[in-house]
């Protein structure tokens, strides 16, 4: 099997193993289902790393470094995505301050509740780590050696985004109609494709696996930008403040991407 085909199969194997380990589950948010899916994700990580390292030997003497498992510039690999995503969600944080919900981030009890939640562990810790290892560190790295970085940025996010269609079965088991599930997951496909392209670019540019992992965790925690909610704020001052915050945040985000200030380099 060629390296290009393998790079496309790795994301599929992730979804298959996650579902195989939870084949009798009825609710993906049930703690027992989450635990079983963790096992499938971890097995997929192990298999993907071994297979990718095997094929990368034809292209490099250091497969693990090529996949982004490295310690050089570790500080920048943590601070860069943290600052980058804080800029992207600046408007969101200002919105939370106006809504008086920003304090949740500084409350120990709230953090304790989060860490005790299996769903939170999946969405913020295990999900971003295991998905980025398979989709970015393994699949995109191997694909880039076969098709080049530009084609990889365009192609690699497709299986990542399409993998979310498997939630249609979860939705139906929870009582949602097929039409509702398809529409919801179709929209999810669109924005996860965009994120996948962004994360793939981060992986190939920085060669640090932790960079897209942190960006992924940040996006899972914050969700989509809520600029469409701004007109619902009754006070004109709040609306102007939010429009300004989102604009400044997006501008800073683009500036950091364009100039690559603070970005770790391999």
UniProtKB/Swiss-Prot annotation:
GO molecular function: cysteine-type endopeptidase activity; metalloendopeptidase activity
Keyword annotations from UniProtKB, A to Z: Endoplasmic reticulum, Hydrolase, Membrane, Protease, Transmembrane, Transmembrane helix
Cited Pfam families: Rce1-like
EC number: 3.4.26.1
GO CC list: endoplasmic reticulum membrane; membrane
Catalytic activity as recorded in UniProt: Hydrolyzes the peptide bond -P2-(S-farnesyl or geranylgeranyl)C-P1'-P2'-P3'-COOH where P1' and P2' are amino acids with aliphatic sidechains and P3' is any C-terminal residue
Active site: 131 (proton donor/acceptor), 164 (proton donor/acceptor)
Entry's localization field: Endoplasmic reticulum membrane; Membrane
Enzyme class: hydrolase
One Gene Ontology biological process: CAAX-box protein processing
Keyword Hydrolase: yes
Membrane topology category: Multi-pass membrane protein
Membrane-crossing segments per the record: 1-21, 42-59, 78-98, 186-206, 210-230, 239-259
Coarse class of the protein's main subcellular location: endoplasmic reticulum
Domain of life according to the entry: Eukaryota
Iron-sulfur among keywords: no
Site (Transition state stabilizer): 216, 220
Task performed by this protein: Protease involved in the processing of a variety of prenylated proteins containing the C-terminal CAAX motif, where C is a cysteine modified with an isoprenoid lipid, A is an aliphatic amino acid and X is any C-terminal amino acid. Proteolytically removes the C-terminal three residues of farnesylated and geranylated proteins, leaving the prenylated cysteine as the new C-terminus.
Family to which this protein belongs: Belongs to the peptidase U48 family.
Protein name: CAAX prenyl protease 2
Species the sequence originates in: Caenorhabditis elegans
Name of the gene encoding the protein in the UniProt record: fce-2
């Amino acid at each position: 099997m060629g390296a290009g085909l393998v790079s496309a199969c790795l994301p599929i194997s992730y979804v298959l193993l996650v579902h195989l380990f939870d084949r009798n589950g009825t609710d993906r948010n049930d703690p027992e289902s989450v635990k079983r899916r963790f096992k499938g994700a971890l097995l997929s990580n192990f298999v993907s790393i071994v297979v990718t390292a095997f094929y990368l030997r034809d292209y490099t003497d250091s497969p693990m470094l090529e996949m982004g498992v490295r310690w050089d510039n570790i500080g920048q690999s943590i601070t860069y995505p943290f600052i980058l995503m804080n800029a992207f969600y600046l408007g969101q944080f200002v919105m939370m301050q106006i809504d008086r919900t920003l304090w949740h981030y500084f409350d120990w009890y709230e953090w304790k509740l989060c860490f005790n939640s299996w769903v939170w562990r999946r969405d913020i810790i295990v999900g971003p780590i295991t998905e980025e290892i398979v989709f970015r560190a393994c699949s995109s790295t191997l694909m880039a050696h076969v098709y080049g970085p530009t084609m990889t940025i365009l192609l690699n996010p497709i299986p990542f985004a399409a993998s979310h269609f498997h939630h249609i079965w979860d939705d139906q088991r929870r009582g949602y109609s097929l039409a509702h599930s398809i529409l919801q997951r179709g929209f999810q496909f669109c924005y996860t494709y965009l994120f996948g392209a962004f994360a793939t670019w981060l992986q190939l540019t920085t060669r640090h696996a932790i960079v897209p992992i942190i960006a992924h965790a940040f996006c899972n925690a914050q969700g989509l930008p809520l600029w469409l909610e701004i007109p619902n704020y009754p006070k004109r001052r709040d609306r102007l403040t939010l429009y300004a915050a989102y604009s400044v945040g997006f501008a800073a985000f683009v500036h950091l991407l364009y100039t690559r200030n603070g970005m770790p380099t391999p």
